[in-house]
Amino acid sequence: PWSEAQALCREVGVPFHCDATQWLGRMPGEGLDSCDLLTGSFHKLGGPKGIGFLRTSSEGSVRLLYGGQQEAGLRAGTENVPSILGALASLEESMREIADSSNRDLFEKRVTELIPGIQFLGAAAKRLPLVSSFVLPKFDNLRWINRMDRLGFAVSTGSACSTGRGGPSHVLAAMGYSPEAARRFVRVSGGWSNETDDWIALADAFGVAYEEL
């Protein structure tokens, strides 16, 4: 509910920053131009790694690097033109292919048939259309990751931002999951280029892994 968070910030005169990295290219971006600070990263759209953007309003202006006057004086240093062009191309392509949740929903239906007792997080809430997070009925998530890797699929135990952190997820704890259940948490995400067959193959691979573990 970013708009509600923005309203609270406006009430107390605090600039509002929205990290739209997971949003862009997956859902329409109406209203985001009202944010004081808006950031995103283009590798999530299939663009080059290491290139992102910061959009500011007069209320949210911030200078990141001092020195030269590149990029309206906000970030000194020579611009990475090839990556910028690649970023724009990925954004244009992804906006032509705005995703819906049909493939993710098909994946979740198929996995439910193959793995009894699986629990999907936020199933009744508005979610990103190409991300599915779930708690598996048995086995440590690292065993699942290793087995899925051998089957040709890369899945994760959480966001890249949490890599290297010890202990169960504080987010899962806040949602009421026990530390033991949190150790069975797995997340998968797709891109705009993934087809229905890719999602079905991923679901079937989870079924194979379930039988093999």
Where in this protein do the model-derived segments appear?
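Pyridoxal 5′-phosphate
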Residues: P1-L213
